[in-house]
Each structure stands twice: as C-alpha cells, then as structure tokens.
From Swiss-Prot:
Region of interest called Disordered, as start-end residue ranges on this chain: 1-39, 56-75
Protein's membrane topology: Single-pass membrane protein
Catalytic activity reported: a long-chain fatty acyl-CoA + 2 NADPH + 2 H(+) = a long-chain primary fatty alcohol + 2 NADP(+) + CoA
Biased composition (Polar residues): 14-29
Free-text function comment from the UniProt entry: Catalyzes the reduction of C16 or C18 fatty acyl-CoA to fatty alcohols.
Annotated protein name in UniProt: Putative fatty acyl-CoA reductase CG5065
UniProt family annotation: Belongs to the fatty acyl-CoA reductase family.
Organism of provenance: Drosophila melanogaster (Fruit fly)
E.C. number(s) listed in UniProt: 1.2.1.84
Peroxisomal topological domain residue ranges: 598-625
C-alpha cells in the first residue's frame, strides 16, 4: 500500500535526509540577539545540551550542523541556537521511513467470518495499563472496560501521589465517584481489578519503581496513553515535559513489555490547527522534537517564556504545539511497536455512558455554558456559522477501545490515525449549539442564577469589547460593591476574570473552522459486528444535538453544581422573576436613553411632539375611539 503522506511538497525529501540549516545562524533581530546572548552568558549547562543534540546526529530529523558542532567543542548545537534565536530553517523535517498516513482498508464485517474476535472477548484475560486514568477521559475508559469487558484481567492505573494523599487513597476516591455507581451496585467485584501504580508522568521512567515496571512488563498487553496537560496557557517547559517527554518515557517502557499488542496514544485533532484540512496523517513537524527537549533543558525559563510565541508559530498555545511534536516523538521512538493515534476534537459530556450528560470539569464549552446558565456570560467573539466540532467523551472512549482491538488483531506495524470528530458526518454550528444551550438552561435553570440567561455571538471585536464591559464587568463591579456594603465577601469580578480567561482560550477555535477527515474511523466502524457496534458506540451520525445539549445541561447541573432534580420547580419560579426583571431593565434603559436624547436635541424633541400630535389626530378618525 502506498504511503498517503500529507503535504507532499513538505515531505518528499528522502527519509534519511537532514534538515538544512545555516552553519552560523544569526538572531532574527536585536531583541532576540540580546535574549540569546544573555542566555549564553547566564547558562552553565550548555555543554550538556551540545552532547544531547550531537548524539542525535544522523537520526530522524537530526541536523548536520549539530554533527559538525560536536567536533568544534561549541557550547550548544546549531539547531538549538537556531530555535532560540527564532531563525530555524523553514525546510520541514523529513518523516521517517514509516507507515505514516496509511488509510485503513475498508473491510465490512461478514457474518460468516469465523476469525472475527468480539471486542469483549479480545480483552478477556488481558491486562491494561492506563496513563491519565484519573482524568476526565481516563475515568470513563476505566468504567467502560470494567462494565463492557467483564473478563478483563487487571487495569493498572498510573496515579501520582497528590497533596500528601497516597495512591491507594486516590484510587478509593476515584472508584467512589458517581461515575462508578452502577458498577458498585451491580458488579462490585469488578472494581478490585483496578490496581494503582505509583508514578509521575513528569519523572524519569515515569516515576515507577523497578518492581512495578517489571510487573507491567510481564503482564500488560494493551496500553492507553491519555496523560497530558490540557491547560492551553501552560508554560512551555511543563507542557513539553508532560506531553512530549512523558510520551517518550512511556514508549521506552512499552519496548520492554513482553506481550504488547496495542499502544493507543490520545492526541488532539487540533495539533494541526495551523492548516484547514486535516487528514489522518502525521504532518511534517515545525521543529525536531529532540531539539525542543534539549532547549527546555538548558534555556532559563524566563527566556523560554519570552521565546514561546515565536516557537509555537501559528499554533495558538503550547498544548497544540507540544501535542503535534509528541506525535513525531511517538513515530520516531515506537519502532515496530503496534501503535495507533486517536485525535478527538473538543471533548464534552457523555452521550449515553455510563449515563447521559456526565461531566466532571468546567473545561471548554462546559464552563461557558455554565456561566451562561448563571446569567454571567452574555457575549463572545465567535463565527456563528462555523462548525462547533464537539464530540461526547463516551464516543471517544469507545473508539479508543475499538482501535486497540483493531491494532492488535490486524497484526501490522503500520501506524494508523483516527480523527474522532463530528464536523464531517454530523455537524452542528455554533449558533445552533448556543440556541439549544439557551433553551435548555432556561428550561432547567440553576439555583442561584444572578440574571436571566441571554447573549450573542459576534465577530466585531470593538462591539464585543463594549458589550463585555457593559454586560460583564460593569454589573460585576456593581454587585461586588453592594456585597461589600452588606458586609459580604465579593466574588463576581473574580468569576468574570476567570470567564474572560476561558473565553480567550476558546476564541481561537470559535472563530476558525477545520475539515477533519475521518475515513479511518468510518472504516473501523464497518469492521465491527452489529453487536459490537451496539456495545461500543462511536458512530457520531446518530447524535441528536437538541437532546444531547439538554442532557448536557442537566448533567453539569447535577454533577458539577450538585443540584438535584427536586430543586427545579423553585429554580423555574426564580427564572420567571428574572425574566420579568430583565424585560423591565431593558424598558427602563430604552426610556432613559430616549429621555437623554430628547433633552439634548431640540430638533428631536420637536419631531417627537409632531409625531404624537399626528398620531392623536389619526386616532380621532377611528370611529370606535
């Protein structure tokens, strides 16, 4: 099968060719020169950086300049200097001679196929290792495996000790969450299959003890890597450490596993957000991942923070930047491991499993819809006719489980990528999503709403800024002022600042549109038996967005705000009062504006008097008046 490598003009260099760089790169401008000179003067560990960069000479994406620098005894590699100075070559790094960008064969399930192994049967007797198991997606993955693959042997969770809490206590807290309620009642013994592994994704060897490493290497045959920092404004150093180095360290562990059948890496559809059309391929990286890792090891963090905007280029944040490089790290380091990458778009509340509307965080649209429900969010920069590519978390998890099954059973080292998105097969635009959300938060209001939920999407920045001041911050300062007078603690301004920060992170994705191709997802769907399609649902064409958004609102009402359905009647009465107050406020605002204009313009006053006089005359012509 031929390699469907995207952007041929960027990647048609021979696989073993090197990135072209100037022998003596110069800073792009005087400001960068000062930063770089200051760095070289203040940093003592540059010799180590040179050895790291030089050791990669001749490997995938390595720099010929780095190799020549080794003999000169220079303090750092030419590649690292180029990156720091912001003058790295525009020539894209070649992709390694791997099966990047393959399209999955389109094979339909046949009822007479005796070789077909059901997904649950595939997981029977197997042990699974999960990173990020205490996160939003990880929790749903653990619950789904326990519920739908009852003969699974063990699930090992990488858990970090946190705030003095041991991993066993954190696991107990996890399994006592509402998400596992049905399992606790119906299959309590299944929970004993979950085994904590103490570790830290930011540490060498993942912070796992030698004993636990040996345990994993002997027993694990499927690995799900979902650990990541999803903070869009994360520092580059920490983002690289978690998203890139964490991936590299996990792959090193996987190479030691005696019976590994599948490694599923969770990326993001937006790792290639610098292009409009995104296929199920790995695109040429902006930099050699090893150079970026070398850079964070020797560059002072304050200088690194200043250079971050130049490094990430057209990408909006460190999250998408490091996720893109992590895919290349995986492609380079995996070798002959059976690997697949799942790229979800914006992950939101569950569609059906384990119950509709489950969500445990305020990230992304959840936080904004929650603020809308509270009456604290009324305007946003957004292209209302663009696709809001959101995907329910259980859809992503079912795809991950099926992708691991397919990776293991097809017995091929070719890396496949699955874009898990809704925009191509069942799109919803932002205006429709907001309309459904507005209807739902009014129908199922939160307790303690501050105002009647309403708002608009805009693409006029000055108008949006004026509305933010008038509708967000001005009322917030007034309410906090009243709170201080009454001797209460002010909080509204602080909440509005958090909302503004969340909006700023989401704005990039709400004002742009992408076309994510999902042919591999569609092909995988058709290889499943009808029964497996019912158990592991990831066909996004069946999502009813109106019903989904309503369940979404009911879900965060119950699971985030801890408000029971019994409180809805009282909340609806309060919502009705807020509606009348909202209408009265608008009427008063119109009258005050009109009164102000009348007092400032004699001509307008005369026109108004003339209008009233003519209206009165016409009224007298009506017989019954």
């Amino acid at each position: 099968m031929s390699h469907a490598v995207a952007n041929k003009t960027e990647t048609e260099a021979a696989p073993n060719s090197s990135l072209k760089q100037s022998a003596a790169p110069q800073p792009a401008n005087s400001h960068d020169a000062k930063l770089l000179n200051g760095t070289l003067a203040r940093t003592n560990g540059l010799t180590h950086a040179a050895s790291v960069a030089t050791s990669s000479s001749g490997s995938y994406g390595s720099s010929s300049a780095a190799g020549s620098n080794a003999g000169s005894g220079g303090p750092t590699s030419s590649a690292s200097l180029s990156i720091a100075a912001g003058v790295a070559s525009s020539t894209a790094l070649p992709l390694p001679p791997s099966s990047n960008g393959l399209q999955m064969p389109y094979e339909r399930f046949r009822a007479d196929d005796t070789s077909y192994v059901p997904i649950a049967q595939f997981y029977a007797g197997r042990s699974v290792f999960i990173t990020g198991g205490t996160g939003f997606m990880g929790k749903v993955l653990v619950e789904k495996l326990l519920r739908s693959c009852p003969e699974i042997r063990n699930i090992y969770l990488l858990i970090r000790p946190k705030r003095g809490q041991e991993v066993s206590a954190r696991l107990t807290e996890l399994l006592n969450a509402p998400l596992f309620e049905s399992l606790r009642q119906e299959k309590p013994k299944e929970l004993s299959k979950v085994i904590p592994i103490s570790g830290d994704i930011t540490s060498e060897e993942l912070g796992i003890s030698e004993k636990d490493q040996n345990l994993l290497c002997r027993n694990v045959s499927v690995v799900f890597h979902s650990a990541a920092t999803v903070k869009f404004d994360e520092k580059l150093k920490l983002s690289v450490t978690i998203n890139m180095l964490g991936t590299k360290r996990l792959v090193e562990l996987c190479h030691r596993m005696l019976s590994l059948d599948a490694l599923i890496h969770v990326s993001t559809a937006y790792c290639n957000c610098d292009r409009t059309d995104v296929s199920e391929v790995i695109y040429a990286p902006p930099y050699n991942p090893d150079d970026i890792i070398s850079l964070i090891n020797w560059l002072p963090e304050d200088i690194l923070d200043q250079l971050t905007p130049r490094l990430i280029g057209k990408r909006p944040n460190t999250y998408t930047f490091t996720k893109a490089l992590a895919e290349h790290m995986l492609l380079k380091e995996a070798g002959n491991l059976p690997v697949a990458i799942v790229r979800p778009s914006i992950v939101t509340a569950s569609l059906n499993e384990p119950f509709a509307g489950w969500v445990d965080n305020f990230n992304g649209p959840t936080g904004l819809v929650s603020a809308l429900a509270k009456g604290m969010f009324r305007t946003m920069m957004c292209e209302k006719n663009y696709v809001a590519d959101m995907v329910p978390v259980d859809i992503v998890i079912n795809l991950m489980i099926a992708a691991a099954w397919r990776t293991a059973t097809r017995k091929s080292n070719n890396l496949l990528i699955y874009n898990c998105c809704t925009g191509q097969r069942n799109p919803i635009i932002w205006s429709e999503f907001v309309k459904h959300a507005m209807t739902s938060v009014r129908k199922h209001p939160l307790e303690g709403c501050l105002w009647y939920p309403t708002g608009d999407l805009r693409m006029n920045r000055p108008m949006n800024t004026l509305n933010c001041i008038a509708k967000h911050f001005l009322p917030a300062y007034i309410l906090d002022g009243v709170a201080r007078i009454m001797g209460k603690k002010p909080f509204v301004v602080n909440v509005q600042n958090k909302i503004a920060k969340a909006v700023e992170c989401l704005e990039y994705f709400a004002t742009r549109q992408w076309r994510f191709k999902d042919d591999n997802v569609h092909a995988l769907l058709h290889t499943l038996s009808p029964k497996d399609r019912e158990i592991f649902v990831f066909d996004v064409r069946h999502i009813n967005w109106d019903k989904y958004v309503e369940r979404y609102v009911l879900g965060f009402r119950e699971f985030l705000f801890k408000q029971r359905p019994e409180s809805l009647p009282a909340s609806r009465k309060r919502m009705l009062r807020l509606y009348y107050l909202h209408q009265l406020t608008k009427l008063v605002a119109v009258l005050l504006t009109w009164r102000f204009l009348m007092s400032r313009s004699k001509r307008l006053n005369d026109l108004w008097s003339s209008f009233l006089e003519n209206a009165l005359r016409m009224a007298r012509l009506i017989p019954f008046l």
